[in-house]
């Protein structure tokens, strides 16, 4: 479907059952045309609004990561079940390269190509575009399970989530009161500068979960992207922009306790910084990630 053709969202669908994170930051839309196992059969759309913005009034990198993750799961999951929506796709790993800035206002679009489907895994790659411009390239691996099995696990976990204790932030962390519109829309986060990076903490909320009742992969990457740009800015004193991001999902999280992430900046120069981090919840490692950040001089205040 050409990006320059007006999009009739009435011909598109949203996930059923509802996905709290996608509904909160989206909605995200998709349409399947023809054989879901073929390249280009799945077309995804994210209408962009002010809440998706970063400091430069472009679409936040975390929003693009979340949309790429959505597209990966759609392309890989529907290839695994032939378009029947009987599979639940969970991201194992994903890599995204940012090629251009997305503007707030026009919709983002994504499509992809299933590469291989095995008994447990599905591999796919694709792109995110806007008005004919390629904004990002993505590739990744999903694990696919029966949707009925994933929903049963959600039902088992619901009582524990409803009895979760109030969450608190340790002393020494400062609220990021001037965070970007997208980051604030997701929820408050707190930071502490380290000698070689930063540590960030974010209390979790129900809208950060996916339809399976665990923390959404797009949410975790959104938090990680905010963390790497914050750490790069604190260490270098320059304005950061993510140009590449890769993540490996190690375990599932839930909305009962805060997430924390320690970001290191092993090396940086005048124009690039290289970062890595680990996202944890109550000592459990959930996400390992790395990023390349473009640096530029900050505009005079």
Residue ranges of predicted features:
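Terminal targeting signals and extreme-terminal segments of soluble enzymes
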Residues: 1-301
